[in-house]
């Protein structure tokens, strides 16, 4: 029993966001009951509903609430209703990106695994998916070619050109590498750093700095892999990977590939962290407005996002493992929502939340 209290800013957002967030609340209620942890939770508008109620996708009151909290549990934003707005005023770009910038969330964590009983959903061959895999992609989120200067277009005709610049500072690589190694210590103690050090100067520095940081983690095994080989190895033998450490653009590619080979995007959580371990936790999927309000959405990604919050921002590893174990038990027992049930009877969104909370309390 930890007898600790944490303040959580809860931002359900749009589409299926409120429905799946309600299930995360059930699970956190169960954690409170079992572990003696107290979560002070307040819900605030973000995204399309914030546009409707406040005239902008990210009200100042929501930002203030996040600043006063230990972590942010985020649902999903966006939908056809707001697509007519200018791009910067739409829910996705007007809410998530400013939040990441305001809180300097430089690290993105994307776990991807095949749960027992769901191997058939993977597009991989049965002999590969049957071996299972459990990977966390640690992606640098604020540097690299997406943000480097100069970038632009100039000239005309045959001489017209476009250019982007890949830039990484030593401190940016150091801080993301430390999170990768610390994450590995909580798992199977292996880090594979992805780069293109046979071609790119930025990757040469990346590899040098990662090697230096590795000296502080002698208990963690470090390997390096070129990005082109890594994309092939993920298809051939994903079980070889534990923590994959990536730059911004390589992490963008690798995390989506990892998501695809699980075969179940509705199951994948995501975390974005800053240097003080403050984090924003959200499902990797979208707001799915086509199924909103039907009580059929899969809440597992939202629930597992809450587990990541407990692990990385709150330091409650035992509670995080309880949630993940409860999810695995439910899935192994064939308790599935409509996206996974095929020809079997499907659980509703709320029934799935009830089941996972029940497994936590009975474990």
From Swiss-Prot:
It catalyses: (2R,3S)-3-isopropylmalate + NAD(+) = 4-methyl-2-oxopentanoate + CO2 + NADH. This is 3-isopropylmalate dehydrogenase. Transmembrane segments: none annotated. NCBIfam families: leuB. It comes from Vibrio parahaemolyticus serotype O3:K6 (strain RIMD 2210633). Pathway: Amino-acid biosynthesis; L-leucine biosynthesis; L-leucine from 3-methyl-2-oxobutanoate: step 3/4. One of its GO terms (cellular component) is cytosol. InterPro entries: IsoCit/isopropylmalate_DH_CS, IsoPropMal-DH-like_dom, Isopropylmalate_DH. It holds the Pfam family Iso_dh. It is found in: Cytoplasm. It is an enzyme of class 1 (oxidoreductase).
């Amino acid at each position: 029993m930890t007898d600790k209290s944490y303040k959580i800013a809860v931002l359900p957002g749009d589409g299926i966001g409120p429905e799946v967030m309600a299930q995360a609340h059930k699970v956190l209620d169960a954690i409170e009951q079992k572990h003696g942890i107290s979560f002070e939770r307040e819900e605030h508008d973000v995204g399309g509903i914030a546009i409707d109620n406040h005239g902008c996708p990210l009200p100042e009151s929501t930002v203030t609430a996040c600043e006063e909290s230990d972590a942010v549990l985020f649902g999903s934003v966006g939908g056809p209703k707001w697509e007519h707005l200018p791009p910067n005023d739409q829910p996705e770009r007007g809410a998530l990106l400013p939040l990441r910038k305001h809180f300097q969330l430089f690290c993105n964590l994307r776990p991807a695994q095949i749960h027992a009983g769901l191997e058939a959903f993977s597009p991989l061959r049965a002999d590969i998916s049957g071996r299972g895999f459990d990977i966390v992609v640690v992606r640098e989120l604020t540097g690299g070619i997406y943000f480097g200067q100069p970038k632009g277009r100039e000239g005309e005709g045959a001489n017209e050109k476009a250019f982007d610049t890949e830039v990484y500072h030593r401190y940016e690589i150091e801080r993301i590498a430390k999170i990768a190694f610390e994450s590995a210590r909580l798992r199977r103690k292996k880090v594979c750093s992805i780069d293109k050090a046979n071609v790119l100067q930025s990757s040469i520095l990346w590899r040098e700095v990662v090697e230096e940081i590795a000296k502080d983690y002698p208990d963690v095994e470090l390997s390096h892999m070129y990005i082109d080989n890594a994309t092939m190895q993920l298809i051939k033998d994903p079980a070889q990977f534990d923590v994959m450490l990536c730059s911004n653009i390589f992490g963008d590619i690798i995390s989506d590939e990892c998501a695809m080979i699980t075969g179940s995007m509705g199951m994948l959580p995501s975390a974005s962290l800053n240097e003080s371990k403050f984090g924003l936790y959200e499902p990797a999927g979208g707001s799915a407005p086509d199924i909103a309000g039907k009580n059929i959405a899969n809440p597992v990604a939202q629930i597992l996002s809450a587990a990541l919050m407990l692990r990385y921002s709150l330091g409650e590893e035992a509670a995080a493992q309880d949630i993940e174990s409860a999810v695995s038990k439910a899935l192994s027992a064939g308790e599935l929502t409509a996206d996974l049930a095929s020809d079997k009877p499907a659980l509703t969104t709320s029934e799935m939340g009830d089941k996972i909370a029940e497994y936590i309390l009975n474990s």
